[in-house]
Amino acid sequence: MKFVKYFLILAVCCILLGAGSIYGLYRYIEPQLPDVATLKDVRLQIPMQIYSADGELIAQYGEKRRIPVTLDQIPPEMVKAFIATEDSRFYEHHGVDPVGIFRAASVALFSGHASQGASTITQQLARNFFLSPERTLMRKIKEVFLAIRIEQLLTKDEILELYLNKIYLGYRAYGVGAAAQVYFGKTVDQLTLNEMAVIAGLPKAPSTFNPLYSMDRAVARRNVVLSRMLDEGYITQQQFDQTRTEAINANYHAPEIAFSAPYLSEMVRQEMYNRYGESAYEDGYRIYTTITRKVQQAAQQAVRNNVLDYDMRHGYRGPANVLWKVGESAWDNNKITDTLKALPTYGPLLPAAVTSANPQQATAMLADGSTVALSMEGVRWARPYRSDTQQGPTPRKVTDVLQTGQQIWVRQVGDAWWLAQVPEVNSALVSINPQNGAVMALVGGFDFNQSKFNRATQALRQVGSNIKPFLYTAAMDKGLTLASMLNDVPISRWDASAGSDWQPKNSPPQYAGPIRLRQGLGQSKNVVMVRAMRAMGVDYAAEYLQRFGFPAQNIVHTESLALGSASFTPMQVARGYAVMANGGFLVDPWFISKIENDQGGVIFEAKPKVACPECDIPVIYGDTQKSNVLENNDVEDVAISREQQNVSVPMPQLEQANQALVAKTGAQEYAPHVINTPLAFLIKSALNTNIFGEPGWQGTGWRAGRDLQRRDIGGKTGTTNSSKDAWFSGYGPGVVTSVWIGFDDHRRNLGHTTASGAIKDQISGYEGGAKSAQPAWDAYMKAVLEGVPEQPLTPPPGIVTVNIDRSTGQLANGGNSREEYFIEGTQPTQQAVHEVGTTIIDNGEAQELF
């Protein structure tokens, strides 16, 4: 009896000592324990998703892929699979399972290794939310105490729901919703028992038990899960026997991107990071942009096709690599495909290896092991590239270009395969809605994988003649009209700073004598623009450009500004052209229409300032002081004094502008009105002439009229010195678009090509705005305006139409006439008088008409 008594006393003491030790340990680490109450309002890390305007997914950013699901959305069989595998006594314990611990310890003792885990689902939840993955005794103790706390705070169903959404299941998939999508391309409710068992087997070792890493291990682990489900009575013997014989059909499924717009998506990502920091990638934001599939894909296709066409006409630079030489042993298929799989794809360009070649045809293997045939049709373009200005002879047979062992690039053209190459030239396109600034399409380069540099918004490039419409607008605001006569003859002026004559020339170097301003813009006459610049004053012109949103620091105050020496981005140029297209309003480009949180609540909605040419909104700069000299249509070239320039450039009247920004309803804000609506109409009309010309002459943008077959469009070419940059910018109904093409290496120019009879409809000659950039503009605008009714240019109030003489710009007095638009009060009042010959006054200092 004494032994029993002492034993009981000892047992009680041990219990008290153990309890006291546990309590003391708890009190010691309690301050270090996180507050589990946060689980009540936990926010799971959900990636940011970016959508098009019509709700299609275009990008996803975030380290963790997660698709949150509620417990009632998860099939009961999947819940049971996890419980059977991870914590069979889940509904019986209070966070820690002593029975499970004893069982795991016993197995470890008798087997010599730990084959069973002792952590409950609640402990795993505590570890995943609050603790580091380190394996230490202190971490395990904290895990136990946290699990007990969690059980006191949450119901079993709440714990399960959090666990099944939080657990890591491999391949960046967190939670069963993401795992179902990643491995099987399904939602959880579409999974079979076989697939549920595969996913339920992943928590123990997601990197090695997943079927993408090792199918054998995945099958073995699935069978373990099925066995435990059978032991727990969750499935029948028949289900077990049938399911364990089924194959696992798993593949990696990336997020279901409807279409790609990588440059714009990256702009959205940067904007979201600037607003929300790292939480942008974790809080499940859904961002809706302003682009649509049809328009964006038309832009990408137009840019890529145009870049490839340019690249092809300049010749083939040879294979990307030589894998084995002719005469050497060919590589086996596995080695070829492994090498090709390691290479990127660029848009439509796929890496390939030439496995055989004869004069009529070559065979090339792709990364997936399939082969394609390259006939003479697909390699005929591949004249040897010698320089940007010189190409070799057209190949006569396939083996003039291709040999076995070469690593090349190919692309599909219709049903055929063509030889290709990664282009060295690059391009950008920006398209916006001129009424409110919404970005309709944006392409920052040939391919985002090739270069992430966004040329649409980051590349400052000289704009060439793309600047002329803005400068002519300034000149007309100063007193010129579309009928003003300017002398198209060569200029030669001494430049003291350079120590030489400055001799701007037309391109091509053809001169027509006195011509109207409309023709000067339509034919992009450089010397005519220089004369207009001198007439209105360089400083005035430079400051006027700021009305169109161009940064002052990028504008030079020299006469070379007339030839486009200023550098702007395609986005800035498109914004400027929108002013001319929308009646004179400076809209702000924007690309995010709405941001939702993970619950679908709208936390941001764009409210852009819009153009309203029919509204009575004053120009924020007030009235420009007119020059009496410019208003006189019959004077020689003049240079306005610096004093007159300065006083004639009004500054924005901010108070008036702020009043003008609020509509009569008080709900809609207007964009700043920077040039008056009649003036915007005049330059818009002149841009139309750049495409359609007049009887007797053709505009530099004439190809757009041929390609689009509609007359409600306008635009302007742009080419810089040595053709380093080429542009085409213009408008159509409800759209303004700017296209640039050039080399990132400023030392290279676009060059020229000789015609090859082997290539159908090939562009040849010197590259420039009309040949190098406009084809992309035409192709894009044709796609965007398909089905859009033609909208004739309608003069706004304040515009009068007068019949003028083409040769003098005065009132018509015979058959050589056309109708011309004028701002009311600026129309000519004198009848045209035709004289024999043209007099150019020369007093030793090159004095000419304007």
Curated annotation (Swiss-Prot):
Intracellular or extracellular location(s): Cell inner membrane
Catalyzed chemical reaction(s): [GlcNAc-(1->4)-Mur2Ac(oyl-L-Ala-gamma-D-Glu-L-Lys-D-Ala-D-Ala)](n)-di-trans,octa-cis-undecaprenyl diphosphate + beta-D-GlcNAc-(1->4)-Mur2Ac(oyl-L-Ala-gamma-D-Glu-L-Lys-D-Ala-D-Ala)-di-trans,octa-cis-undecaprenyl diphosphate = [GlcNAc-(1->4)-Mur2Ac(oyl-L-Ala-gamma-D-Glu-L-Lys-D-Ala-D-Ala)](n+1)-di-trans,octa-cis-undecaprenyl diphosphate + di-trans,octa-cis-undecaprenyl diphosphate + H(+); Preferential cleavage: (Ac)2-L-Lys-D-Ala-|-D-Ala. Also transpeptidation of peptidyl-alanyl moieties that are N-acyl substituents of D-alanine
One Pfam assignment: Transgly
Pathway: Cell wall biogenesis; peptidoglycan biosynthesis
Transmembrane region(s): 6-26
Gene Ontology CC terms: outer membrane-bounded periplasmic space; plasma membrane
Periplasmic side stretches: 27-850
Membrane topology type: Single-pass type II membrane protein
Its biological purpose: Cell wall formation. Synthesis of cross-linked peptidoglycan from the lipid intermediates. The enzyme has a penicillin-insensitive transglycosylase N-terminal domain (formation of linear glycan strands) and a penicillin-sensitive transpeptidase C-terminal domain (cross-linking of the peptide subunits).
NCBIfam families: PBP_1a_fam, PRK11636.1
Protein name (record): Penicillin-binding protein 1A
